[in-house]
Amino acid sequence: MGKPLIALGLEGSANKLGVGIILHDTNGSAKILANVRHTYITPPGQGFLPSDTAKHHRAWIIPLIKQAFAEAKISFKDIDCICFTKGPGIGAPLNSVALCARMLSLIHKKPLVAVNHCIGHIEMGREITGAQNPVVLYVSGGNTQVIAYSEKKYRIFGETLDIAIGNCLDRFARIIGLSNAPSPGYNIMQEAKKGKRFIELPYTVKGMDCSFSGLLSGVEAAATELLDPKNPSSVTKQDLCYSLQETGFAMLVEITERAMAHIRADSVLIVGGVGCNERLQQMMAEMSSDRGADVFSTDERFCIDNGIMIAQAGLLAYKTGDRCAVAESTITQRYRTDDVYISWRD
């Protein structure tokens, strides 16, 4: 029968630093013991620099680990493995977290497991929602991919050809001076709810791939022209946020539906930070309803980057014998989803 296994997960691929502790019982069920997070937030109009983000992670990771262990009511002797994000992500923050994982592994003599960030999102989403074999729409600040599992890999059926949808939303939020707290995308969503006019913007879909740079350029040009005080236009920034969301999300729904039709899938799972967006969830639900399919998503505890998803995916890999030697515990900024061998699925 074995014994329950416990993993510590460390995530820091962008401006969110997360620490999670998960327990897998002997029957395979998962229990979240702790899931804590701290976000590096910059002033309105500014993004986050890699060096500053890494400094934030170095300052907060030990306090967060202590908080996680206090919530879980366990100690390092109870941990079976330490899981960390190998990539994809921003180099300096990734390195800061990987360095901490190495240090903890050596001090406490616990094995390391390197985890792909996207696989973490998928496996946590599957665990929380119960989705068995969905088409996955992975949407975040750095990634936009349509994914499905086949023959021991999560295959990418479509993706952005340039910038991610989250990056598009974040950059427009900076252009119009929205706050970065709690996140630019959240504030875009709130402004979009007040929008009343739809402004036509560039729409670029190529098969199951899409492009958001033209959309960003288009909405930026519209903002410069229509929001000019000298322009008599009655268009508001709320209208532009609404139009940006409707256009970008329609592109995402189209490529997701095309992938579902291609592989005859009966469900879709939305993961990643942008997956929290209520309008995206609504549009995906309408499409899925028309197809007689199910749509799954999670709340902000699991959509937004977190440590528990790294612990979940890492522990699944650990149980099939996956280990990462300290000497090989490097990071890979462009770590492709389909580069990972999925040993724990049939």
UniProtKB/Swiss-Prot annotation:
Which residues make up the binding site for a divalent metal cation?
117, 121, 138, 305
Name the Enzyme Commission number(s) assigned to this protein. Answer: 2.3.1.234
A GO molecular-function descriptor = N(6)-L-threonylcarbamoyladenine synthase activity
Alphabetized InterPro entries for the sequence = ATPase_NBD, Gcp-like_dom, KAE1/TsaD, Kae1_archaea_euk
Top-level EC class, please?
A: transferase
Q: Which cofactor does it need?
A: a divalent metal cation
Output the Gene Ontology cellular-component terms: cytoplasm; cytosol; EKC/KEOPS complex; nucleus
According to the record, cofactor stoichiometry and binding are noted as: Binds 1 divalent metal cation per subunit.
> Coiled-coil ranges per the record?
none
Subcellular localization(s) per the UniProt record: Cytoplasm; Nucleus
**What functional role does this protein have?**
Component of the EKC/KEOPS complex that is required for the formation of a threonylcarbamoyl group on adenosine at position 37 (t(6)A37) in tRNAs that read codons beginning with adenine. The complex is probably involved in the transfer of the threonylcarbamoyl moiety of threonylcarbamoyl-AMP (TC-AMP) to the N6 group of A37. Pgp2 likely plays a direct catalytic role in this reaction, but requires other protein(s) of the complex to fulfill this activity. The EKC/KEOPS complex also promotes both telomere uncapping and telomere elongation.
State the similarity comment.
Belongs to the KAE1 / TsaD family.
Indicate what this protein is called per its UniProt record. tRNA N6-adenosine threonylcarbamoyltransferase
Gene field: pgp2
